[in-house]
Regions:
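A short C-terminal boundary segment appended to hydrolase-like catalytic domains
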Residues: 75-209
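Conserved beta-sheet core of the metallophosphoesterase superfamily
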Residues: 19-92
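Active-site beta-loop-alpha junctions enriched in small/polar residues
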Residues: 8-12, 42, 67-69, 114
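A structural motif corresponding to the C-terminal end of an alpha-helix
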Residues: 1, 31-33, 97-101
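Short acidic, glycine-rich surface-loop motifs adjacent to enzyme active sites
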Residues: 1-16
């Protein structure tokens, strides 16, 4: 099985996680959680690949905050906090794979930035949550029927979110891709070349016993 924790934490309107979030996340990683999904800050916060301090083979994918899905907070809640970020959200996806021995692994993750387009439609206030993928950027304006200003707001929103999660997302994706490649080689050998695994096990150094 795989374990996912969805947690309500962090300081509102801060685009960087606080130390308490980091401490809790590390503890959850050490306990064996595979994925941590955070919320509450009303802004997007970074992603991170956490390494267990008790199991050298275990790592945890963490996004500290997915921001706002639907928001009436436009340019900022006060002069203390940066404008625009409360309009942003993140569609966070995780892919799991189950193997023949019943074990489940996290095999991939991704983030699609979203922007809340609050506008007037026939005198009524309307909210549209717009998913923003870079490869379709040139279609945003036509697909979502945006004004030039709204299109620019979409671009700014995308840049804000990827500026926050991009580094951590890349680290997670790189590790998961490498782990999957190694894992599939292992399972292939398990199915078709079991003698190779037996040889490796025989040649592996014995564990040191302590009393």
């Amino acid at each position: 099985e795989a374990t996912v924790m969805y947690i309500h934490w962090g300081n509102e309107y801060e685009t960087v996680e606080n130390q308490r979030q980091r401490d809790i996340a590390q503890k959850l990683c050490d306990l064996g959680f595979d994925v941590i999904v955070g919320g509450h800050a009303h802004v997007v916060q970074p992603m991170a690949l956490l390494e267990s301090t008790v199991d050298p083979d275990h790592k945890t994918v963490c996004i500290y905050s997915m921001g706002n899905a639907v928001s009436n907070q436009r340019t900022g809640v006060s002069d203390q906090f940066p404008p625009g970020y409360t309009e942003d959200g993140a569609l966070f996806t995780v892919t799991f794979e189950k193997y023949s021995d019943g074990k489940v692994y996290v095999s991939g993750t991704d983030v699609v930035p979203t922007w809340v387009n609050m506008h007037s439609n026939k005198g009524a206030r309307e909210y549209n949550i717009l998913p923003l993928t870079k490869d379709t950027e040139q279609q945003w304006q036509a697909s979502y029927e945006l004004t030039d200003q709204q299109f620019k707001s979409c671009q700014k929103s995308y840049d804000r979110t990827m500026g926050i999660v991009g580094e951590g997302l890349e680290a997670c994706q790189t590790y998961l891709a490498q782990a999957k490649e190694a894992r599939e080689e292992y399972y292939y050998n398990l199915a078709y070349n079991p003698e190779l695994l037996e040889t490796e096990a025989t040649e592996a150094p014995a564990a040191e016993e302590t009393t």
